[in-house]
């Protein structure tokens, strides 16, 4: 059973019933829906299409909504694009004008207040670099350092600047509320800068009665500097290497990636590693050697999940990308000593009862050479605590709640199974063991460890461990 989870972005290349089925067969655990593009009507069509496929397949694929986030973009140009030349003067303005080769309008009205002479402004993922010469009212006077073509609506980054723009735009608020109504399992919050940003989204979710979990996307130095607080407030983080690689020097990205994965593991939180993992498979049926090594290294570091973006959204080989990623993950995991890794989980707080029992369960499973840990959970809390320990064997998490089952599909090493409601706890436990037999790793005569909270249904009430020989 593969432990590392695979997230696939749904787009034109994958948004049809045939390909969605192929992605599930190939190993997709989570489907990502990018709200930077498209309308609510289009998003609902995609959501409903995958939901129908998953219903027929009884596949507990988790649904992840990725917000647009607080971003700065250029407005329109005369003719749609211009050519900038190294050394020329170029002005950014907050006035709503039609841009040309000398002057362009930006969407963020307070940018002149947030930048100063000597700073840098990057356009189009850093392909265009401007040096800020001076700021005068609504005008930011610049010199082009790296030139090239610039077209409508390209993104603007300001490395090192602490932008004062609000974290949740009206568009994001509308998107999140819409996502709550549809029933997304996770919200990926773009450009998260602080714990307060996470809490602002949590407030919207609570008001809508949503139990969606929050994955904070770390994409700038503000997020890096506030990483510990963000992890405490969020359910996990995403190492969003695209914008992060624009905001910080490229040589810092691998160092920061390892730091983020390590800190998330220490706090028992989800960590997703994303961006250009198999980028060459947008056009080619095989990845580069560097890409396969990149995927493996993220798994060696301890990432919870690895994500495909354009590869499955608009690439020529979406199914092959997932299969390739799954093969790399399985081979890498076979090389990892999880017993040593479990004992090396550093500084994790196990003072609450569920964490202590979960740790004990994992130790027992190692001692008796269990084929699997089986948990019966109503809230998913026990599964999260078990996953955080990185046990030697897989975790089969049984629940009658389909939404909780989907959420657990983003937990490291957790394999969710939907079981029917039962009249008693013992009936649920028996149903869970029967469900575990459907996995190739669990056969009659094998030893498994069962853990749950009695009575069932109380989050954080894990208090029971049993060692069972499968009949």
Where would I find each of the regions flagged by the language model?
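Non-catalytic helical/linker scaffolds that mediate oligomerization, partner binding
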Residues: 1-471
């Amino acid at each position: 059973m593969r432990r590392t989870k695979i997230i696939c972005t749904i787009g034109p290349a994958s948004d049809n019933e045939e390909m969605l089925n192929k992605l599930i067969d190939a190993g997709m655990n989570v489907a990502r829906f990018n709200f930077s593009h498209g309308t609510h009507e289009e998003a609902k069509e995609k959501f409903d299409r995958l939901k129908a496929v998953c219903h027929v397949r009884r596949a507990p694929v988790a649904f992840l909504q990725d917000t647009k986030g607080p971003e700065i973009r250029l407005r329109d140009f005369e003719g749609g694009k211009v050519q900038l030349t190294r050394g020329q003067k170029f002005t950014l303005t907050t006035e709503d004008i039609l841009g040309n080769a000398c002057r362009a309008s930006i969407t963020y009205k307070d940018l002149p207040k947030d930048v100063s002479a000597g700073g840098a402004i990057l356009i189009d993922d850093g392909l265009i670099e401007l040096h800020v010469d001076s700021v005068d009212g609504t005008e930011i006077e610049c010199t082009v350092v790296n030139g090239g073509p610039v077209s409508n609506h390209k993104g603007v980054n300001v490395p090192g600047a602490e932008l004062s723009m609000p974290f949740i735009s009206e568009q994001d608020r509308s998107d999140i509320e819409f996502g709550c109504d549809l029933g997304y399992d996770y919200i990926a919050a773009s450009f998260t800068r602080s714990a307060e940003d996470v809490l602002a989204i949590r407030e919207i979710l609570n008001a809508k009665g949503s139990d969606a979990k929050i994955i904070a996307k770390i994409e700038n130095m503000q997020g890096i500097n506030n990483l510990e607080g963000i992890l405490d407030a969020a359910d996990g983080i995403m190492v969003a290497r695209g914008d992060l690689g624009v905001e910080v020097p490229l040589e810092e990205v691998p160092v920061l990636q390892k730091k983020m994965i390590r800190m998330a593991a220490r706090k028992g939180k989800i960590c997703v590693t994303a961006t250009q993992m198999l980028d060459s498979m947008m056009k080619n049926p095989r990845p580069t050697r560097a890409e396969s090594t990149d995927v493996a290294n993220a798994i060696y570091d301890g990432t919870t999940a690895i994500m495909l973006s354009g590869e499955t959204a608009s690439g020529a080989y979406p199914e092959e990308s997932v299969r390739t990623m799954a093969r790399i993950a399985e081979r890498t995991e076979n090389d990892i000593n999880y017993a040593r890794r479990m004992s090396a989980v550093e500084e994790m707080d196990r003072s609450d009862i569920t964490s202590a029992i979960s740790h004990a369960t994992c130790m027992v499973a190692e001692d008796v050479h269990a084929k699997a840990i089986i948990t019966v959970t109503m809230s998913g809390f026990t599964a999260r605590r078990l996953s955080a320990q990185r046990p030697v064997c897989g975790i089969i998490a049984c629940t009658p709640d389909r939404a909780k089952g989907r959420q657990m599909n983003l937990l490291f090493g957790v394999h969710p199974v939907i079981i029917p409601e039962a009249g008693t706890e013992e009936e649920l436990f028996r149903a869970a063991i029967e469900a575990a037999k459907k996995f190739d790793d669990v056969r009659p005569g094998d030893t498994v460890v069962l853990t749950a909270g009695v009575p069932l249904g109380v989050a954080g009430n894990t208090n029971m461990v049993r060692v069972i020989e499968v009949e």
